[in-house]
């Protein structure tokens, strides 16, 4: 799974289309950056850009946009309704896929330092990247706005994190940092604005003030009336959907509305949404209603229905889910995008990758998929009605493991590429040799981690496979036999891939611990596969 970071720079220009387009072009032409949205506000005189890419790519994209803005925006002439303190007012980095918050903090720091050095402008860090508590929030840093900067920069407490403490009239100052993904989510009500606002006050974390806090953490809220749709909305911002989820906000709003005898008529997501936010909601409704829904497409359709996301306008997942707008591949083509014929051809080509690690992952993924298939060939059939609850329990682990193992096909090739890249680093000076050694050891750790994860994933499947072998559709007997051997073979491949990469590692404690773990996982795979095959043979007789 490729890494994906979202960057949302806010530039202080919302009227001059030539400037807006020039900044868009600067982002779009940066390799590895995908521009998803450009939202220009004439009255605020501000444009919000949304683009994504791998960490190093989005830093370059933000810098390219800033360079362009420095030539075209003059803050001495800027007027607008939105608070601002610079030509590039704020530039947050947000983790979307395969990236930690710490990595986004590094993005913000790298961007801030390079921006300050290149343009010689003051830069502040906020959010998760803040260096001091007083700079945690954007409003705190932006207090007084652009007009206050000449005096503010003279104060010791407002020395920039990067760049000069001198006022740059044409630019102002920039704030950059890292934060969680913000989701704008509105619940529709057939009510008055005041009733909607009453619900919002009960829900939002701020509540009605310090003495009357609301129920939902990391949620902002207000009630308003949407004239063009002739209904009211509880309008919320979810500052961290992993603290308070979409479905939690919706269900709590419904409960509040029910107490006031008000009808809820769906909801609205504004802008883009992370896939995980919808899948978390799907898991909630599947659990609540005891539903058996496996496919991602079906789970999203369930959420659209339960939350009424299409009540005001069609909700097209391909246009609204951020991961769907960007292919899950890095700068190079993903092996998973290739046809089976092309994948086999590439394995057989005169190159070291994809190699045994990717093949082991593919074989294990097929083994898990076969087990899932057998479960589904048993589930929902009249003669196996008595097994429905059992299959509902057994199928999901195989379905999930198949997807996880499939992702390791690419992960193994990427880990090998990282090792190869480290080996090719220069080693002419002591510093270069140290840097190369560190990079190589880190690359080897990744090259060990991928096959170890394969073996650990398969290890979780043996109990379910044993049970499936004893009660699954007997007409699929050969499929389960192949599944057992495929899973065992995947672990067999993982074992040797771990050992070959451990050989060049220098951490003896890690080597011994990992060698012991992978050996036990291989022995377990051999034993469990034999037991599954024995159970199947006994049933055949």
From Swiss-Prot:
Superkingdom of source: Eukaryota
Catalytic activity: 5-formimidoyltetrahydrofolate + L-glutamate = N-formimidoyl-L-glutamate + (6S)-5,6,7,8-tetrahydrofolate; 5-formimidoyltetrahydrofolate + 2 H(+) = (6R)-5,10-methenyltetrahydrofolate + NH4(+)
A molecular-function term among this protein's GO annotations: formimidoyltetrahydrofolate cyclodeaminase activity
Pathway: Amino-acid degradation; L-histidine degradation into L-glutamate; L-glutamate from N-formimidoyl-L-glutamate (transferase route): step 1/1
Signal peptide residue numbers: none
Gene Ontology BP, a term: L-histidine catabolic process to glutamate and formate
Start and end residues of each stretch annotated as Formiminotransferase N-subdomain: 1-181
Keyword entries, A-Z: Cytoplasm, Cytoskeleton, Folate-binding, Golgi apparatus, Histidine metabolism, Lyase, Multifunctional enzyme, Phosphoprotein, Transferase
Subcellular location: Cytoplasm, Cytosol; Golgi apparatus; Cytoplasm, Cytoskeleton, Microtubule organizing center, Centrosome, Centriole
Gene Ontology cellular-component annotations: centriole; cytosol; endoplasmic reticulum; endoplasmic reticulum-Golgi intermediate compartment; Golgi apparatus; Golgi membrane; plasma membrane; smooth endoplasmic reticulum membrane
Residues the entry annotates as binding folate: 163-172
Subunit structure: Homooctamer, including four polyglutamate binding sites. The subunits are arranged as a tetramer of dimers, and form a planar ring-shaped structure.
Family as reported in the entry's similarity comment: In the C-terminal section; belongs to the cyclodeaminase/cyclohydrolase family.
Listed name of the protein: Formimidoyltransferase-cyclodeaminase
Organism: Rattus norvegicus
Organism lineage string: Eukaryota, Metazoa, Chordata, Craniata, Vertebrata
